[in-house]
Amino acid sequence: MSHLDNGFRSLTLQRFPATDDVNPLQAWEAADEYLLQQLDDTEILGPVLILNDAFGALSCALAEHKPYSIGDSYISELATRENLRLNGIDESSVKFLDSTADYPQQPGVVLIKVPKTLALLEQQLRALRKVVTSDTRIIAGAKARDIHTSTLELFEKVLGPTTTTLAWKKARLINCTFNEPPLADAPQTVSWKLEGTDWTIHNHANVFSRTGLDIGARFFMQHLPENLEGEIVDLGCGNGVIGLTLLDKNPQAKVVFVDESPMAVASSRLNVETNMPEALDRSEFMINNALSGVEPFRFNAVLCNPPFHQQHALTDNVAWEMFHYARRCLKINGELYIVANRHLDYFHKLKKIFGNCTTIATNNKFVVLKAVKLGRRR
């Protein structure tokens, strides 16, 4: 846990999933503190919109203003709810919207934590363009190293005149005034043909590797299991290309597409609808934190290309949680397949959780591993 003192309230904040005590990661950063400083003496009139509040630092600090927390991460929503409870703040003080929803009209203040991907930032700025006014105070923040010329140009292009502050504690802010500059329409998704198939893959703004098939998924697809039956999971599904291939290779199976990103799940659904509509009755789509809340002993197989970062931080906490949930939700003799960078050494992590692990395939960068749920472990 970490403490954040600001002009609104003193907070105790925790990351979600929690990090270990040996290598703790903080649940807020200097950019959060810097953003809150700008509002200390500001009268807030109209709705407060907070975008990409990773662990709820801004939402908790501004809870008395009933802010809207907008983002594309269900884990961030869970983190914010947990930190509201931790600080004795009514959860209903914050209204949660995902990035595909319509934003509230005429906000008084918009606070943006600059996301990792420029595509998501552009989608969010275009959504803001429809609701902000010239009186809306628009402030964005990030580590100074993550604010580039292209970031500032995007604010200018979509919203209007933009300036940046001096760095403070290695953080920098962006101030923007809306004046409705001319702007061409942009498609909701980016699409590309998947080689070796007649499929067109559609990707919303925040989907990993949205402009083409990433090399890890490409390697994984060469080693996917065939002729499985029952329910199988594409965990951390992204655009659903793994699950789509599983539907094709396993005609007797049902595939459950799971991701914490609403945009990823929307992309997966769109890709099944447009490429294998006949398989929709064998498909389920779920926005979730891994397999949290899913009944145990349900699935025959889980397939996963786990992330090794959360927001801007490198961490295996999310992957570790995925593996534990996968084991809980697999049937006896159910199988977990993963692809990962070789340097992450997931072989020993899986062996610790499952008691076994087999290398299916490897190249100079990636490894495909399989672990089997052999029975109950203490």
UniProtKB/Swiss-Prot annotation:
Catalytic reactions on record: guanosine(1835) in 23S rRNA + S-adenosyl-L-methionine = N(2)-methylguanosine(1835) in 23S rRNA + S-adenosyl-L-homocysteine + H(+)
EC number(s) stated in the UniProt entry for this protein: 2.1.1.174
Keyword Chloroplast set for record: no
Record-given protein name: Ribosomal RNA large subunit methyltransferase G
Function: Specifically methylates the guanine in position 1835 (m2G1835) of 23S rRNA.
UniProt keyword terms in alphabetical order: Cytoplasm, Methyltransferase, rRNA processing, S-adenosyl-L-methionine, Transferase
Annotated compartments: Cytoplasm
NCBIfam families, A to Z: PRK15001.1
Family: Belongs to the methyltransferase superfamily. RlmG family.
Pfam families from the UniProt entry: MTS
Domain of life: Bacteria
InterPro entries: DNA_methylase_N6_adenine_CS, rRNA_m2G-MeTrfase_RlmG, RsmC/RlmG, SAM-dependent_MTases_sf, Small_mtfrase_dom
Cellular component per GO, a single term: cytoplasm
A GO term, aspect molecular function: nucleic acid binding
